[in-house]
Every structure is written in C-alpha cells, then in structure tokens.
Amino acid sequence: MACTTILVGKKASYDGSTMVARTEDSQNGDFTPKKMIVVKPEDQPRHYRSVQSSFEMDLPDNPMTYTSVPDALGKDGIWAEAGVNEANVAMSATETITTNSRVLGADPLVASGIGEEDMVTLVLPYIRSAREGVLRLGAILEDYGTYESNGVAFSDEHDIWWLETIGGHHWIARRVPDDAYVTNPNQFGIDHFEFNNPEDYLCSADLKDFIDTYHLDLTYSHEHFNPRYAFGSQRDKDRQYNTPRVWIMQKFLNPEIVQDPRSFALAWCQKPYRKITVEDVKYVLSSHYQDTVYDPYGSEGTPVSKKVFRPIGINRTSQTAILHIRPNKPQEIAAIQWMAYGSMPFNTMVPFFTQVKTIPDYFANTYENVSTDNFYWTNRLIAALADPHYNHHETDLDNYLEETMAKGHAMLHAVEAQLLAGETVDLEEENQKMSDYVQGETQTLLNKILFDASNLMTNRFSLSD
C-alpha cells in the first residue's frame, strides 16, 4: 500500500517505549473500509490461502491471540496490517517500497508468492520477539518468494526491527538504534548495513554472495555498504512522491538540520532534538507540509507549489495504528494500540488495551454502506465536509484531537493506578468506555462540521425572511 512509516526507539521516546506507526493508504481513486478485531486461536487458519496470488501453506497449530486491522469487506483478502499478539510483540505490514531493474533481473518477483495481504496473518500469531518476527518472515520469503517489494516493522518492549524485501526471495533487516527514529516512505530505506554484526543486522543467508555475483554494491571500497544504493531507486517520481515525506518528518523532529526535500541522501534514521511523544507521531503522520509553500491548505505557496508534493496526511488513508509497547508496566497493559481511521488531518488517535478478546463495535463493526454507527465512516464524513474549508474548521479539529487524546492518556493512567493498587480491572470494559466517549465526541464534531459547512455552501444567500 501507499503508506508512510515512523519508528521510534525506546531511548528516543518520551516514556521509554518502542513505537511503530504507519498509515495504510489506498491507491489513488480508491478507499478501503477497515475494522479492528481480535483474532483468537480458534479463528486463525491452519491452512492459509491467499486471494491475490496462488500462495498457500500450512500454519502451526499453536497460534497466539492477536489484534488485527483487516479490510472490513474482505473481498480482496485479509490485509491484517497491524497488531499486537499476547506476548506483547507487534507487527506492521507493509510499507510498499521501491526496487530496481538490476535486482529484479537477478531475483525476479514471484507471482505465486506472498504479499502485504498475507504477512501479518502468517507471522504475528507465532512470534515471541521482534527478532523472531524477522527470522520467520525471512524464512517464508526465502521458501515461497514475494510478488511485491515491501518494508515490515516488528517490535517488542526492547527492540524494533525493520525488514525490507529484495527481489523475489532476498531480504535485509536492521535493528532501529535505541536513541533514534526512522522515517520511511514508499521507497527502499536502509542506508547502512554491517554483515559482521548479527546483533543489529540480519539478512538472507546468501545476500553477500548475491550482491557480489550481480555487482549490486554501488559504494566505493572504502565506504560502508549502502543497501539503498544497491537495492533501491533514484527516480524522478521519488523526488515528488517519497523524499519530501521524509524531509517534512525530519524537519519537525530535527528542525536544526537543513535539508532538501528532493534529496536522495536523507538519512534512514536520526536522533531527534528531543524525545518523541504519541502526539508527535500523530502530527507527522497527519502532515500536509504545514508552514511551507507546499501546504495545500496554506497561504504561503502558489497553486503549483501546493500540489507538487504528496502529503503524508492524504485523503485516502484507510487506517493508522501506533503500536506502543511500554516498559515497566503490568504485562496485561504494557501494549497499547492507538487507532485512527480515515484522513489523518481530520481525526484522532484512540488507545486500546490489546490483551482482550473483543473490540468495541464502534471500531469493529465497519460495513460497506456509509453510516455514523462506526468510527471509520464518521471520520470519512468529517474529512469530506471539512476539507473545502479546512482553515475555518481547523480550531474545532484541533480541540477535538487534544481533548480526545487527553482522555486517552487519562484512561491509561487510571487503569495502571488501579492495577498497581491491587484492584481488578476489566480491560474490555475500559476499551468500551473509551470507545463510547470517542463516539460521543466524534458525533459532536460531525454535527458542528456539518452545520458550519452548510453555512459555507456556494449557494448560500445572506437575506432571509
């Protein structure tokens, strides 16, 4: 999918957590309704068949429970996208990335292989660490191949790993430095790799021979190996579609660094100028190039500059999950899955405890027809109504975001305090309370946006009886 990813190491985050976040964006002209569910062991397939390809394989008989954000309609496959399992291991898959003809000539894509549709279902229920996730997915890639190029994130309380596929059967992975964050658009990202450091770098067994055989290393002999040069792209499209997204995220998280939005040398990871919060992650994944000439809603640019770069906060985002694995917490509340549906400049992030058996209907009961009975369609309505007059509605949107996320933090603090006091807490009930609150606030926002948008219609007239 046409997504944007940010990964935050535990020493770069405000609370010592690891954070993995990604927008799932549909293709241009398409929109994909999503829902959040819990997949219990009895619901996990023992023999898996893909819809997008002819791939199939037997799965282990001991899956763990895990959260999932599948397509609501299911006609194109599962597309589970993001979740946390009962071992508090998280996975986000996938970020569609680029490749090049040299790689594809050496290791062609495999039409019968796996893709984004399949990966979470095949891996997340069976792993007990982020590293295990890399190794399981890597083994499947080597055995079955893939029909597309993808980046995949795995995280646990201690580590975040980022894996990128190379051609049909190869892969490479790097552990995110603890004191750094990673920004990754739809482009091959890893720009440094050490073959002699398996603690922080992993790859398919024959990758070094593969590189040597097909002359893929484009670095000089005295330089470190740069996988982005070997396996990635430097296309004109990347300068319009990909590198600007990295630039604007790093501009916010490292304002002291001056960079070119069209540069191919933007770093895969950076140490932020201060620690990163959940709100920061929400902000950068909602970015439309605020305070630059590239902002389509701004006043600084020209009609041309406002349309030149692809925003992160785009109209066709299906869902966004922040997988927040917190240290030094009771295990049942260590993992939080913050969820948003729809276009990011117009929504909020809602926290859910993941060690549960069900998800509230407002987030789980998405269906084909437009309705205000669920979070997905209500957010889509708000975005479509507010977009033509964004600056008029901006204060209402900001207030809604601040108030609902404050309520989310308050809920997390209250539940932790209860558990530490020895009280019993029903986490499904707490999730339901949060959902009910957000449903009320979202309906209130929709009412206000609709009223204001109606008064801004082109056919309005100031005189009345």
Curated annotation (Swiss-Prot):
The active site is at C3. Keywords: Dipeptidase, Hydrolase, Protease. One of its GO terms (biological process) is proteolysis. InterPro entries: C69_dipept_A-like, Peptidase_C69. It catalyses: an L-aminoacyl-L-amino acid + H2O = 2 an L-alpha-amino acid. One of its GO terms (molecular function) is cysteine-type exopeptidase activity. Its EC number is 3.4.13.19. NCBIfam families: C69_fam_dipept. This is Probable dipeptidase A. It comes from Streptococcus pyogenes serotype M3 (strain ATCC BAA-595 / MGAS315). The lineage of its organism: Bacteria, Bacillati, Bacillota, Bacilli, Lactobacillales.
